[in-house]
Amino acid sequence: MFNSEIKEKYLDTLSEGMVMQMRPIFAKAEITETLYNKDIYDFTSMQILELIRSFDQTTIGSVRRTLALLSLYIDWAISYKLSKGLTNLARTISEEELYECLGDKKLYITYSELEEMENQLVNYQSKAVLRLLFEGVSGLAHSELLSLTKKQVEDAMLNGNVLTLYDSKHGERKLKVSSECLVIALNAAQETKYKLKNGKAKGQTKEVFLVENDYVVKTKRTSNKGDGQASKFVITNLITDISEFFKINFLTPNTIVRSGHLYRAYQLYKEKGVIDNSVRYQIIDDFNLRVKSKYRAVYSMQDYINEEEVNKYYAEELGLKETTI
């Protein structure tokens, strides 16, 4: 479990029946908590909803129950001053938002959808963020993505496509990516303008100038000084713009990262004919994921790295049925 000492203290306060309900929730939440590098009690309301959606529950009753259990845990954390805030954001979630968490809804994009989206995006800034997240570049507060420079991309092109990434908390990490990813990132580093609304802006301002520097992800040029590394909000804004253009409400950095994991699972499924823990361990190694415990990470990955999900998202590629994207 993420932040296991705190969670075990909470479980010690519960009845045996409640522990049996909470422990699986904590176990399944570990991947999402690790990606955001924070405990559930510090999640935003949107992150809480994303977590609930990842459970893929099929009845509104089960969704409500999960929210109620999460709310109790957050209340406890606030009462012991563990949370950074004083408001339980789980209690601000509406019934309408809960219905949107019901299972059998699309949570991830496939590789073919990624390519189709890239073809329709006019800004390399957008293409780069989408592709880099899909191939596993993220880090604490997206620091690997935000610190990525043109030189790092060029070095990777000369070193078997292996990027040297820098996380603000965990330091250096190596990750092998595709040639397509590097080409897109290089183009983004050379981009000087950003077309608003993916080139469909109707106002007087249709494009903005970007700061000219060596970073792949850039901020808008303003009269204020600050031409260095962009903030994490630039990533949020880029993903929001992509979501709005394609009318995709589930797109977040986390779901894009998981989409990349699922694509790798599909590739391994074609090779092995099965999705088991060896496949999940392979994905952890291929993406060089930072996890405290591989065993626990593999357990958490079972929710989305399984044959049902692979068959659901890659049915056409596997010849199971015809699908329309």
Swiss-Prot record:
Q: What is this protein called?
A: SPbeta prophage-derived uncharacterized protein YopR
Gene name, per UniProt, is: yopR
Tell me which InterPro entries the record gives: DNA_brk_join_enz, MrpR_C_cat, MrpR_N_CB
Q: Which organism is it from?
A: Bacillus subtilis (strain 168)
A Pfam family annotated for this chain is MrpR_N_CB
Note the superkingdom of the native organism: Bacteria
Gene Ontology molecular function terms on file: DNA binding
